[in-house]
């Protein structure tokens, strides 16, 4: 039996390894997408503030652009590790739980992209950590959450439900007021005809957790309610899950609004699984072992696809079918244009121009570029991954 110190050391080693891979991915592989460029240059939001501060401090590059979100991932994992300090009887089980949490497909993706999901995840985990340590709610942070993102409406509703269990009138009034305010400020729609997006929602949840893990998540939510061992985390995750299911009957939901509140249930889910596993003799653990192998297979497959996905282009007949196509090639195009001293360009593709602007390629009529071939172009620039053409840029000097 290894000591707690050993597993703590192993935890920080694994976290450091994941952070290294995330930094490598952000710096060497990903390019800014059109939506990310919109947030950086044109929108005014928390994402704009975070990315602008980071690029001001560390330079206008991909690593600086995504650095805040990798940091929020790191903090989310560390605070979750602290929250589950007394969840398990052994340090080994605690490590297994946080290991699964760290490798969640949805969490890793949120750490790599310019989006609010990982920020919401961290703030929610920090709120839970504060509540656990100090045995009181962080009331003063809740109005700030209202300004951060519309998805905190779900947290306010969960806290409203939890206030009845906790018999906390102050929490009841504050959470109800903030829920009503956020509902109207962010103009949530509940109209329209039923269209049935439930299967789509379940499919996205399966991608966030991995398919088998999501099925066990549903069971764990139900099981926790049956044995009446519900806590604040259960209220938050169950509220988000049920709300997303109900909303899916009428409209297509933005899963990033719900995902931060369901992934935090993973340690509780693992606690249920490991308890069921430990109480059985070895000869009766076969089905559980199969479950573990399947879950680990999908998690490591996800890691492979997250960090080594460019070879998938070799399997596709059209490059734009790649699931992260919109996060590729802009940086490479900018580098090729700079090599040719073509730093001022115009194009009918305004999305591409906004992406290139991040790499200091300005919109000015010195050169005309297009992804579509046209008569009498001067030069053709081809971006290749693993010797396969990904995108062609046709250039004409004006």
PLM segments and residue spans:
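Short acidic/glycine- and proline-prone juxtamembrane loop motifs at membrane-interface regions
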Residues: 109-117
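Hydrophobic/aromatic-rich transmembrane helices and adjacent perimembrane loops
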Residues: 252-285
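Extracytoplasmic catalytic/substrate-binding loops of multi-pass membrane glycan-assembly enzymes
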Residues: 15-50, 60-63
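Signature aromatic-anchored transmembrane alpha helix within multi-pass, membrane-resident enzymes
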Residues: 277-309
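Specific aromatic-rich, kink-prone transmembrane helix
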Residues: 119-137
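Short periplasmic/luminal acceptor-recognition loop of GT-C membrane glycosyltransferases, typified by
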Residues: 305-390
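Transmembrane-helix motifs of polytopic, lipid-linked glycan transferases
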Residues: 67-87
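Transmembrane-helix signature of polytopic, membrane-embedded enzymes
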Residues: 80-103, 121
């Amino acid at each position: 039996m290894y000591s707690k110190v050993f597993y703590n050391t192993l935890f920080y080693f694994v976290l450091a390894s994941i952070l290294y891979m995330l930094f490598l991915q952000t710096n060497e592989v990903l390019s800014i997408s059109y939506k990310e460029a919109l947030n950086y240059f044109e929108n005014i939001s928390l994402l704009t503030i975070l990315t602008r501060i980071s690029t001001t401090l560390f330079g206008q590059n991909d690593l600086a652009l995504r650095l805040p979100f990798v940091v929020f991932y790191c903090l989310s994992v560390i605070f979750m590790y602290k929250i589950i300090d007394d969840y398990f009887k052994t340090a080994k089980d605690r490590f297994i739980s946080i290991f699964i949490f760290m490798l969640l497909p949805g969490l890793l993706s949120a750490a790599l992209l310019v989006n609010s999901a990982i920020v919401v995840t961290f703030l929610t985990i920090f709120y839970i950590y504060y509540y656990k340590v100090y045995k009181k709610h962080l009331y003063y942070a809740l109005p700030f959450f209202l300004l951060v993102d519309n998805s905190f409406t779900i947290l306010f509703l969960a806290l409203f439900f939890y206030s009845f269990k906790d018999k906390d009138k102050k929490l009841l009034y504050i959470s109800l007021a903030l829920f009503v305010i956020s509902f109207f400020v962010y103009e949530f729609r509940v109209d329209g005809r039923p269209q049935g997006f439930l299967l789509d929602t379940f499919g996205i949840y399966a991608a966030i957790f991995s398919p088998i893990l999501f099925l066990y998540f549903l069971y764990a939510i139900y099981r926790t309610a049956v044995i009446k061992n519900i806590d604040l985390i259960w209220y938050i995750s169950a509220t988000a899950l049920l709300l997303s299911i109900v909303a899916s009957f009428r409209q297509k939901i933005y899963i990033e609004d719900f995902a931060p509140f369901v992934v935090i249930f993973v340690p509780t889910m693992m606690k249920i699984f490991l308890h069921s596993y430990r109480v059985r003799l070895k000869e009766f653990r076969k089905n559980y072992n199969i479950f573990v192998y399947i879950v680990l297979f999908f998690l490591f497959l996800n890691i492979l696809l997250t960090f080594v996905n460019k070879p998938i282009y070799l399997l596709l007949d059209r490059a734009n079918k790649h699931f992260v196509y919109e996060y590729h090639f802009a940086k490479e195009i900018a580098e090729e244009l700079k090599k040719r001293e073509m730093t001022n360009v115009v194009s009918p593709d305004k999305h591409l121009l906004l992406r290139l602007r991040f790499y200091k390629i300005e919109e000015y009529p010195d050169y005309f570029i297009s992804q579509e071939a046209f008569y009498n172009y001067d030069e053709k620039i081809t971006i290749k991954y693993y010797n396969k053409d990904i995108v062609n840029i046709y250039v004409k000097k004006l």
